[in-house]
Swiss-Prot record:
Presence of the UniProt keyword Protein transport in the record: no
Taxonomic superkingdom: Bacteria
Required co-factors: Mg(2+)
Pathway: Cofactor metabolism; pyridoxal 5'-phosphate salvage; pyridoxal 5'-phosphate from pyridoxal: step 1/1
Chain positions recorded as substrate binding sites: S10, T45, Q46, D224
Class of the enzyme per the UniProt entry, highest EC level: transferase
Family affiliation: Belongs to the pyridoxine kinase family. PdxY subfamily.
Oligomer and partners: Homodimer.
Protein's recorded name: Pyridoxal kinase PdxY
Any one biological process term the GO annotation gives: pyridoxal 5'-phosphate salvage
Annotated function: Pyridoxal kinase involved in the salvage pathway of pyridoxal 5'-phosphate (PLP). Catalyzes the phosphorylation of pyridoxal to PLP.
One CC-aspect GO term: cytosol
Source organism of the structure: Shigella dysenteriae serotype 1 (strain Sd197)
Amino acid sequence: MMKNILAIQSHVVYGHAGNSAVEFPMRRLGANVWPLNTVQFSNHTQYGKWTGCVMPPSHLTEIVQGIAAIDKLHTCDAVLSGYLGSAEQGEHILGIVRQVKAANPQAKYFCDPVMGHPEKGCIVAPGVAEFHVRHGLPASDIIAPNLVELEILCEHPVNNVEEAVLAARELIAQGPQIVLVKHLAQAGYSRDRFEMLLVTADEAWHISRPLVDFGMRQPVGVGDVTSGLLLVKLLQGATLQEALEHVTAAVYEIMVTTKAMQEYELQVVAAQDRIAKPEHYFSATKL
């Protein structure tokens, strides 16, 4: 059965970030994506200038009411949320999650708690970080913080892999069953590798891949794609190890393709075949 995912996050007209980054790769893995945009911008904000608007929170709820009105909400297998334009949007998204789960009790909520980036500093509206700590975290089934976001969610520093596993389990005690630490940064084993953790109450998997050097400007949307692809693989029945290994390789293929084409925006279309069947392989290790 094809899985249906309601993806609620940012959208850019030019380039790839949020839904504009994840829709195509998720579809390429065989999922139906229902994109619902929290913001519509001309381009992502790392360019330093952009136009567009943040959607009113009520807009999100109205769109989902429309899907419910045609009796299709029960076919939704998961809600994925990413970049929020405001904390109030987050409250509406939790209402949507409750509505989807009422229609399909098996549905999952995957929260990508976008609050900041180790190299870019915090880039979200006031109240969004607090929303994730107080409301997004306990409501989620799967949550995917980077290192900075993990520290904000668990409210203490995380200095190494062992502490990251313990911090992930602190989050699990508050609601989610699965935590993806989608960028270990300086808490990883090695400074010259990109490392991730996938943690449950009784399992912890670590994986690393080479860093891809883009110089001063790192492409935007890598975390968005990582979260979206992981959700698809888990919904399709992959084990934690299989999901983590495929996602790591697929994202690496996108990065390598983007660099080879000397582009700044993620080249998800050019890399599409390698997203579905990566040519590289990285082995996850059980901790």
